[in-house]
Amino acid sequence: MAFDISTILLVAEIALLIPTLLLIILGRREEKGRQTLLREITNTARMVSRQEYFNNVQFGMQTAMKSIRGAVTGSNPRNAEQDEIIKSIEDQIRRARKRGVSVEYLLLKSPDRLQIANRYHAAGAEVRFHSSLIVSDVRYVVFDTKYVLIGLPSSVGANNPTREGYLIPSEGMAEIFLHQFNTKWAEATRYDEYLAEILSEAKSHSPNASVELLSSQLQIPAEEVKRVLATQRIG
C-alpha cells in the first residue's frame, strides 16, 4: 500500500526523515501498524535546528529517570565546538549514572570510533559496537521510553555532523526505536571485547608496539590500553 507522502511533507517538514523511518517501519510487517505509526509521526514530530538538537540532548539526559539509549556516530570532534558538546555529554552521563539511570550507546564498529567510545565508557555509559548501524543517515536517542530525538546529518555519511533533527514525544515511536536498538544491542560487541580485538590485531602485526604508540594510534589514554592488555592478557 502506498503511503501519502504529500501529507507527510505538509506536516512538520519531515521529508528528510521519511526514508529512514520507512526502513524501520517496513521491518514491522503489520500493515495496520505501519499506517498508525505514520499518522503518529506526522502528528507529533517537530523539526529542530542543530543547536536545539543538542539542547534537547542535554535536557533529555538531565531529566531522564530510568534509561538513555542511543545509536550515535561516535566520530571524533573536528573543532572546539564539537569537543565541548562531547564534554557536556560526558558530564550528563556522569550525572545520569549518579541518579541510577541506565545509559547505553551503540556506535559504528570501527577503530576510529574508539576515542568517543572510551570517553563515554569512562563517564559511566555502557558502550557497544555494531557493524551495520544506520547512523550515516540518522542517529537517535530514546529517553525513558517517552520520546525520541532523531538527528540528521548535513549529507549522507557516518562522519558527517548532525545538522538538524526531529523531536518526537511519542511512546509508540519510542517503542519502535527501542525495538531496533535492542535488536542491534543484542548483536553488538562490548567495548572491552572490541578494544581487546583491536589491540590483539595491532600486536599481531607489530609485537613490539609500545603502549604509548598504541595509545597514540587509537587516541585513547595509555592507562586504558594497559588495562585492556592486562585483563585480556594480550602481548
Residue ranges and their predicted role:
Residues 224-232:
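Residues in the recognition helix of alpha-helical DNA-binding motifs
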Residues 103-134, 152:
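DNA-contacting interfaces and partner/effector-binding or oligomerization modules
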Residues 74-82, 110-113, 172-174:
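Short acidic, S/G/P-rich loop/turn micro-motifs used as interaction or catalytic elements
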Residues 215:
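The alpha-helix within a helix-turn-helix
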Residues 6, 19-105:
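PLD-like (HKD) phosphodiesterase/transphosphatidyltransferase domain
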Residues 1-14:
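Feature marks short, highly hydrophobic, charge-poor N-terminal signal-anchor/signal peptide-like helices
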Residues 128-176, 181:
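HKD (HxKxxxxD) catalytic microenvironment of the phospholipase D
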Residues 194-209, 226-227:
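Short amphipathic alpha-helical interface segments
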